[in-house]
């Protein structure tokens, strides 16, 4: 660190938020949430122990819809009842002087039906992920696509209510946002599919509503 002293200097974001240094902890899945997506005390203490010396902590991805959890022990931000638990994480991080960021996502076709009570996953198109045993998802209707965008916006509202300093949108790892952009998983023939510009509409709409 002594050979790169700028890393430890404060950094001010364009919106005026000052980070104590330029170190960030990436969002790493712990699979320690309750079965219903609520926060455990172990998870709160996990983040408390890592806060303080690092400038910003990005908390592991939170599903924005109850069809969206991609792994066991995932935490959610899909309803207002989840806010209280998430607020404990944000408070623990900020009490140590670090900024708290929450990553939000939807797993789309990468969701195992067993994680959502045996229901069929949803995705841009009814095309299964290229992996053994993957379920064929149900294609979202146009109205459901609009509703999903709104759910990302609601996720941001809840993150702010919980006291987080910011939100990171998870648009990688072949989850729902990336599924809309890829022609391998998006073969829709409406305004949300087809051309690259149309396939980019969902990611851009999510960005717009969460900005």
How would you describe each model-predicted region?
Residues 57-61, 100-104, 162-176:
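Short beta-strand segments at enzyme active-site cores
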Residues 99, 105-164:
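Non-globular sequence segments
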């Amino acid at each position: 660190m002594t050979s790169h002293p700028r890393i430890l200097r404060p950094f001010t974001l364009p919106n005026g938020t000052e980070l104590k240094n330029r170190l960030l902890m990436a969002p790493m899945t712990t699979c320690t949430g309750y079965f219903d997506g609520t926060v455990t005390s172990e998870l709160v203490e996990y983040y408390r122990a890592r806060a303080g010396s690092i400038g910003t902590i990005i908390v592991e991805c939170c599903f924005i819809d109850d069809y969206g959890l991609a792994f066991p022990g995932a935490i959610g931000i899909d309803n207002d009842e989840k806010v209280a638990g998430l607020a404990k994480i944000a408070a623990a991080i900020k009490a140590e002087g670090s900024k708290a960021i929450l990553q939000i996502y939807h797993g789309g076709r990468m969701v195992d039906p067993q994680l959502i009570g045996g229901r069929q996953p949803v995705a841009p198109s009814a095309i299964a992920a290229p992996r053994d045993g993957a379920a064929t998802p149900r294609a979202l209707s146009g109205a459901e696509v609009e509703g999903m965008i709104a759910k990302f916006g609601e996720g941001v509202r809840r993150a702010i209510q919980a006291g987080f300093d910011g939100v990171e949108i998870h648009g990688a790892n072949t989850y729902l946002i990336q599924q809309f952009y890829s022609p391998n998983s998006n073969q829709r023939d409406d305004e949300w599919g087809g051309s690259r510009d149309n396939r980019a509409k969902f990611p851009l709409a999510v960005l717009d509503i969460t900005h």
